[in-house]
């Protein structure tokens, strides 16, 4: 795909832009205004260094050793030592997309101009992204305060020519990787090591990518639910605008509108409009209310991620002297202030909420799948488990087992990360565990996509039991056709794992919503 470049200015990075850089190798550049802000910030550090006052992380030790003064001759060594000592992560390595998300989100935070670094540091980060030099970063070790220290330290080691990096699929020492990309290692100066490793960027980067994916899953779930509505001979009367105008939650109204648009022109729905059924089961009738609540939860997370992507989250922060109170360290012209912007609680709580919401999305999707398959509840025109010659054949019985298993997993992933740990000699006595929350959310997205894919697979099979002369809605027909590109109708028992994987991948890649958008000549919200 052709991907436009992303301009880093510290103010306008979006989840979509993170996705473009992380997954599609969009090139990055630094805005002129950001460069000026960084230069001004570095000049303030130089001004502070000219005095005798203790300034945290500039001429002192770190954490519980912040009372230790560091001689001027040792300040560069202090920064390099910080990066080395904090590179103590464990566990599986971050995938390339997560590493690139880590790089671009840290770059954008530093570009705001409150971290006291030199432009040179920004330029090397840009070089790593544009030349495809990807630090090897273990996934575990962050407490979500002081930010994501260990992962960011592993990232930062590569800037100073240490550690390992992957280049074009080949692993090599960082010094060799930098040389291959015509990049020079950075000799860190005062404040720069601390600025690099202290922030929420692992949490934010992983959350941004997973949020993009989650919104795709939600739009695909609306599509799957619309197809199930048709195949089960249900009604879209419960999606009438009047119902949602008198309970005006934003997400609910959007999901109801989606169902109406997806099924517009459906001859299947028109065919049984005058039947005797008064109302449908909750899993179909309450789709707008449940999917809408999930949409609101994701919007809640999106607001936090959008803010965090463009925030200064390291500590201390560097300001003009007249912007802070008299107790701040520094001079009349510059102030270096300790704060807590590295604390990931705002993300941890919303990530847990969003993961819980995805568990509910998957749960209601699995219940609709049951109504397609279950001989006790399905409509008379459908065969048990959607199997031709049921009894001899089991049809799609077992894909529902897998969906139910994943729903059970999702319920545990939706638990909030509330455990605390006190570290660094009790100086850092409350942490957020936000990185763990981000990983849980990412896993929840992956599993929910499979559950929604199972519903789409079953909905497409259910279509085979309808009168072929009755057209589906324009949107649901497009989804059916897309499923049939990767999965043939089940005419007799066969292994369905590959079909499930293929349809799940359609959901993850956004291909379901793309097909629907083409058919409706408008994207789903």
UniProtKB/Swiss-Prot annotation:
Its EC number is 4.3.1.3. Contains an active site 4-methylidene-imidazol-5-one (MIO), which is formed autocatalytically by cyclization and dehydration of residues Ala-Ser-Gly. It holds the Pfam family Lyase_aromatic. It catalyses: L-histidine = trans-urocanate + NH4(+). It is an enzyme of class 4 (lyase). It comes from the Archaea. GO terms for biological process: L-histidine catabolic process to glutamate and formamide; L-histidine catabolic process to glutamate and formate. It is found in: Cytoplasm. GO terms for molecular function: ammonia-lyase activity; histidine ammonia-lyase activity. PROSITE patterns: PAL_HISTIDASE. There is a cross-link at residues 145-147 (5-imidazolinone (Ala-Gly)). The modification 2,3-didehydroalanine (Ser) is found at residue 146. Pathway: Amino-acid degradation; L-histidine degradation into L-glutamate; N-formimidoyl-L-glutamate from L-histidine: step 1/3. The keyword Lyase applies. InterPro entries: Aromatic_Lyase, Fumarase/histidase_N, HutH, L-Aspartase-like, Phe/His_NH3-lyase_AS. Belongs to the PAL/histidase family. NCBIfam families: hutH (TIGR01225), PRK09367.1 (NF006871). This is Probable histidine ammonia-lyase. It comes from Halobacterium salinarum (strain ATCC 700922 / JCM 11081 / NRC-1) (Halobacterium halobium).
